[in-house]
Amino acid sequence: MHALFVTATIPDYEKARKELHEEVIPMVSQAPGFVTGYWLAPVGTRGNSVVVFESEEAAQRGREGLEQNPPSQVTVESIEVREVAGHA
């Protein structure tokens, strides 16, 4: 498994949270190879998410999708594709 580790700036958490639940989560959960996702509440304006995919290829496709169609309520600062070393 591979994951996207995303860092974003979130200037308005309430607006971003609404977009997350109404648009982002429904779209991401339909992505090929999607396993699970976690979007963490920001500290200040800095937020992170971890979205897990079945393969590196699926994660790369997820990265490309995010780069091409980022959420409107956040500024994506970085997207890293990382191997999942373990889970419980």
Give the ranges of each region predicted by the language model.
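Short S/T/G/P-rich N-terminal loop/turn motif that feeds into the first structured element of a domain
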Residues: 1-47, 54-65, 75-88
